[in-house]
Design a protein with these regions (language model features):
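Noncatalytic, beta-rich nucleic-acid-contacting surfaces in large DNA/RNA-processing enzymes
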Residues: 1, 7-514
Length: 514
C-alpha cells in the first residue's frame, strides 16, 4: 500500500540509510539562472556553492599524447606499449569546471571548508560577459560533487524545455495549463491512435515512413521518439497511470527490452504489474509480506543494477520465504537502472498538457514546438517548400547508412512539420518586416517563421535585424547589410529564399531630394 511505502520510507530516512536527493526542474534559460540565485537568498550566500567538476584526459587523447611524445623524441613504440603508457595518463586531471545543475548546500552552523576547499572554475577569477565586460568567475567546490555528495545536501536545479513550452502555450492562447484534465479522452487517445489529429496511420506513413505511425505522439516530450512510439504501439495505454509506466520503461536501462516487453507479450504479466519504476519493486515486496527495510534495500540495489544482494545480505532468502514469484526476481536481476515514479509522474503531467494543446490548439502547439524544441534543427529551405520537398529530404536521410546527428535532428523536425501540413496547417514565407528574431508567430491561421531558422543566421544577427527594423524599415540590401549586421552570404541565402523580393541592391537617391 502507499501508506506502507510512506512509513517504510520514513523509517529509512530516520535510520539515515539514505541521503535526500532533491531534483527541481525549471524552464531552461533565464528561469534556471533565477532559481540558482534564489537558493542564495534562501540558504544564504555563504552556504550555497556550485558543484565543481574535474575533467580528466580521455583515452584517445592520452593515446595521442604518448604517440606525440615518442615522435618528438625519435622513439619507436609498438601499439601495446603505447596503450600501456596511455592507460597511465588517462583520467589525469586536465581542468576543472562546474556542474550545470548541481548546487551544494552547507549547514548554517558549519563552515564549507570543513567539507571541501573552494576554487574558481577552470582557475578563472574573472570572465567576460556577452558585452565584453569583466565579471567575477564562478566559485565552485574544489572536490567534485561525487566525492562529497553523501556528506552535503545537493540540489539539482535542472533546465528543462517542457515548462518553457507550457509557458509559451499559455502566453499565446490564454489557456491555463493547470486546468487541463488528465482524463481527457481525446488527449489519451493520442497515445494509441492518430485519429484525434484527423489523420490515419496510412496518411502519416505516406509522409514520414512506417515507424510509430499508428499512434499520434510525434513531437510530444517523453513519447515522440521512434523507440517510445514503438512502446506505445506494443502497449496501447488506456489511462494516465499506464503512461507513467511507459515513461518509467523508457527512462530505465534493461527495463523494457528483453524484460518487461517479453513478459507482457508472453502473457506472464499485464502492463500494470510489470516493473517500471523503483517504487514498483518496494511496493510489490511489501505487499508480499517482505519487511519494509529489506524491500527498500532490494529496491536500492535493483535501481542501481546491482541485483538483489549487497555485501553478505540475505535478501534472496527473505524473498523466497515470502513466495515472491520467479518472474519478478528474474526481472529485477536484469535491470541496469530504474527511474523514480514521482519523477516519471512530473514528466508525464507536462507531456499530457502539451498533448492536450496538440489536439485542441494545433497551431499554438506547432508554434511552441518549432520555437523551443526545434531550435537549430528547423531546415527552412526544405520545410518551407512544402510536403513534397519534406518527403524527398526524409527519404534521402533514411537511405543513409550513417546519418549525422544534425541530419537526425533535422529529420525529426521535418516529420513534425509534415504532420502539421497533413492536418491542413501551413507556414507563411519569412517576412523581413514581420518575422520575429526567434519565435514562430501565429498570423492569419498560419505560422510565420523567425529569422534564426535561416541557415547560418544565428540569434545575435536575428536580434540585430529586428532592432534595426524597429528604427525604420530597410530600404535596400545594402541598408540591411549595414544596419542589420548581416554578411553577404546570408544576404544571398535570404535572396534565394525570396525574403528580399522587391528590395533594391543599393540605396536609391532621387534628384528631387536635393
Amino acid at each position: 500500500s502507499t501508506q506502507g511505502y510512506s512509513s517504510a520510507a520514513s523509517d529509512v530516512y530516520k535510520r539515515q540509510d539514505k541521503v535526500p536527493d532533491i531534483d527541481l526542474n525549471f524552464s531552461s534559460g533565464d528561469d534556471q539562472g533565477v532559481a540558482h540565485k534564489y537558493t542564495e537568498e534562501l540558504f544564504g550566500r555563504d552556504n550555497v556553492f556550485r558543484a565543481g567538476t574535474i575533467a580528466g584526459i580521455q583515452d584517445k587523447t592520452a593515446y595521442g599524447f604518448v604517440k606525440k611524445y615518442a615522435e618528438n623524441r625519435g622513439l619507436t613504440f609498438n601499439d601495446i606499449f603505447i596503450e600501456k603508457l596511455s592507460a597511465g595518463v588517462a583520467g589525469v586531471k586536465r581542468t576543472t569546471g562546474q556542474h550545470p545543475a548541481g548546487i551544494m548546500v552547507c549547514p548554517r552552523d558549519m563552515d564549507i571548508h570543513n567539507f571541501t576547499p573552494l576554487q574558481y572554475a577552470a582557475n578563472k577569477k574573472y570572465l567576460k560577459d556577452e558585452n565584453g565586460r569583466q565579471i567575477p568567475g564562478t566559485i565552485t567546490t574544489h572536490f567534485d560533487y561525487h566525492s562529497i555528495s553523501g556528506r552535503m545536501l545537493k540540489l539539482d536545479i535542472l533546465g528543462h524545455d517542457d515548462p518553457k513550452v507550457i509557458r509559451m502555450l499559455q502566453d499565446i492562447t490564454g489557456i491555463d495549463p493547470l486546468k487541463i484534465p488528465f482524463d481527457d479522452q481525446k488527449t489519451l487517445s493520442l497515445f494509441s491512435s492518430p485519429e484525434a489529429l484527423g489523420l490515419t496511420p496510412d496518411e502519416l506513413a505516406s509522409a514520414i515512413g512506417n515507424k510509430g505511425v499508428t499512434v499520434g505522439a510525434l513531437g510530444l516530450p517523453e513519447y515522440g521518439t521512434p523507440f517510445v512510439r514503438g512502446m506505445l504501439e506494443d502497449t496501447r495505454p488506456k489511462n494516465f497511470s499506464e503512461l507513467v509506466r511507459i515513461s518509467g520503461f523508457s527512462h530505465g536501462t534493461d527495463v523494457w527490452l528483453n524484460n518487461a516487453q517479453d513478459l507482457i507479450k508472453n502473457g506472464v504479466v499485464k502492463l500494470e504489474d510489470a516493473i517500471s519504476t523503483r517504487d514498483d519493486v518496494m511496493n510489490y515486496l511489501i505487499q508480499h509480506g517482505v519487511k519494509p527495510l529489506t524491500s527498500f534495500k532490494v529496491m536500492e540495489n535493483v535501481r542501481k543494477g546491482k541485483g538483489l544482494e549487497k555485501g553478505g545480505s540475505n535478501n534472496r532468502a527473505e524473498l523466497d520465504a515470502a513466495h515472491v514469484p520467479q518472474w519478478f526476481i528474474d526481472s529485477c536481476l536484469k535491470i541496469g537502472y530504474l527511474f523514480p515514479r514521482a519523477h516519471a509522474v512530473a514528466y508525464v503531467m507536462m507531456a499530457f498538457r502539451i498533448a492536450w494543446f496538440k489536439v485542441y490548439q494545433p497551431l499554438a502547439y506547432y508554434a511552441a514546438y518549432f520555437t523551443i524544441r526545434a531550435e537549430g534543427s528547423f531546415n527552412a529551405p526544405v520545410i518551407l517548400r512544402g510536403l513534397a520537398s519534406m518527403k524527398q529530404e526524409l527519404a534521402r536521410i533514411a537511405a543513409l547508412d550513417k546519418p549525422t546527428a544534425v541530419e537526425k535532428g533535422n529529420a525529426t523536425v521535418i516529420e513534425v512539420a509534415a504532420e502539421m501540413y497533413l492536418r491542413g496547417l501551413s507556414f507563411l514565407p519569412i517576412d523581413l518586416e514581420k518575422s520575429d528574431a526567434s519565435q514562430f508567430l501565429m498570423v492569419d491561421g498560419k505560422l510565420l517563421p523567425p529569422f534564426n531558422c535561416i541557415p547560418a543566421l544565428g540569434d545575435a544577427v536575428a536580434k540585430e535585424i529586428v532592432l534595426a527594423r524597429q528604427d525604420h524599415p530597410f530600404t535596400s540590401k545594402e541598408d540591411l547589410k549595414k544596419r542589420g549586421k548581416v554578411s553577404q552570404s546570408i544576404i544571398d541565402t535570404l535572396d534565394s529564399m525570396g525574403v528580399l523580393k522587391g528590395l533594391p541592391e543599393e540605396e536609391q537617391m532621387s534628384l528631387f531630394a536635393f
